């Protein structure tokens, strides 16, 4: 039996800790909601996967691969975590991947693949929405709703600063220097910075007062990589809304197109709003 492929133990950084009161990354806010401290964001953890995925799929992963994760347990600043992937079987283009804390606690579980994205961990989920009348925080968010169209330019400054400061977990030199495709490649956190960050312009005004966190994230490439210092057009939309006993959640998706109109990258994400943090649930 082939051995599981492992990445190094890495002290993941909560680089959003300074967002202040009302953020799940703030120690006081997170502790009040039952966490051990300000949580490390999911995109920080996603940065740790590409070196392992290069060993599984080669550089083709940045061209037409995906990474699809459900987050299971939150970590706090500088807790050590490690990435694992099953070896790729002959004739198969998808593998199971996961992340564990140093003590073995599962942080995230999902899939990675090249080629067909339709059978990923997150795209196999049931996206039938709940009755919107049951929602109190996300009651203005509707399936199919546009979250906007945006023309963007991928600036290098934030990614380079994070790279130089040692904040990107297990970083690839391609994030700062040249790559097989010429310029610098976007790290997963930078894909999120644009494809999630711009969609929040459309979503945030519709969300009631609450503390949010990521429940699941998938990034995928179709005609990648997603490069720095390039122009892209983004289209974002709501997939569905629903709830669990502790949260209300929204699934939404953003596509990035190049100047030829080809889809370069995709983001599918679940954002959760904690009921315990919302005045709408204070009865």
Name what the model sees in each region.
Residues 1-14, 76-142, 223-283:
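HotDog/MaoC-like acyl-thioester-processing domains
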